Amino acid sequence: MVKGPGLYSDIGKKARDLLYRDYVSDHKFTVTTYSTTGVAITASGLKKGELFLADVSTQLKNKNITTDVKVDTNSNVYTTITVDEPAPGLKTIFSFVVPDQKSGKVELQYLHEYAGINTSIGLTASPLVNFSGVAGNNTVALGTDLSFDTATGNFTKCNAGLSFSSSDLIASLALNDKGDTVSASYYHTVKPVTNTAVGAELTHSFSSNENTLTIGTQHLLDPLTTVKARVNSYGKASALIQHEWRPKSLFTISGEVDTRAIEKSAKIGLAVALKP
């Protein structure tokens, strides 16, 4: 694997994962099995209030080609074909949704020691074109993320980001929403042995003049059990505990409470993922 600045989506990813990943407010159940030919079959169910959603997906790997097919409760069929390393550092992704005739898209990713590029184009007469690029190295990375609608001739997305990384600290700054919001994030590894880390994200909106601050932490109680907690400037506090009771099989329970309205019921989420 090429070491370098990565893709634009990697800027601030460590802090985002710490603050938002694995927190659930619904009930989710996922089971994965493998056939004798190596095909992975995954069934998922999600209960959101009175609504229940389900999907079934399969994954087939043949050398450097991976094919993913997913069918949801609305009879939509999502297909993604990924060709890994047709050339050094290159990845090609072709995706489409049936019956949506305008969903076809081709995506190219290229990773280099000093750059990372991701570009995609819709397979329509007037496609949406996306481009993101990062230049730098393992320490400093500077990038941009753009989307251009050829039908209207307008840029629908224009973002920029900067990241600084060291052995135990990652800091990033991003300008999003065509310059309307700016976000700064921070991730610090306190104790690698127990995966103890702290993180924070501060977002300012120029149009509304509002600030949002979220801080969080994580810690390994034992090699198989992780606890996380976070709180934001709106007074919402969340916590979760995740246990890997067998390899790749996770049980997660999380809760959220509004400290400014304790009388309201707390939100409790549950996620179970089973893999052989």
Curated annotation (Swiss-Prot):
Keywords assigned: Ion transport, Membrane, Mitochondrion, Mitochondrion outer membrane, Porin, Transmembrane, Transmembrane beta strand, Transport
Pfam families from the UniProt entry: Porin_3 (PF01459)
Gene Ontology terms for molecular function: porin activity; voltage-gated monoatomic anion channel activity
Recorded GO CC terms: mitochondrial outer membrane; pore complex
Keyword Transport belongs to the record: yes
Subcellular location: Mitochondrion outer membrane
Keyword Transmembrane attached: yes
InterPro entries, A to Z: Porin_dom_sf (IPR023614), Porin_Euk (IPR001925), Porin_Euk/Tom40 (IPR027246)
Domain comment as written in the entry: Consists mainly of membrane-spanning sided beta-sheets.
Role noted for this protein: Forms a channel through the cell membrane that allows diffusion of small hydrophilic molecules. The channel adopts an open conformation at low or zero membrane potential and a closed conformation at potentials above 30-40 mV. The open state has a weak anion selectivity whereas the closed state is cation-selective.
Entry protein name: Mitochondrial outer membrane protein porin of 36 kDa
Species whose genome carries this gene: Solanum tuberosum (Potato)
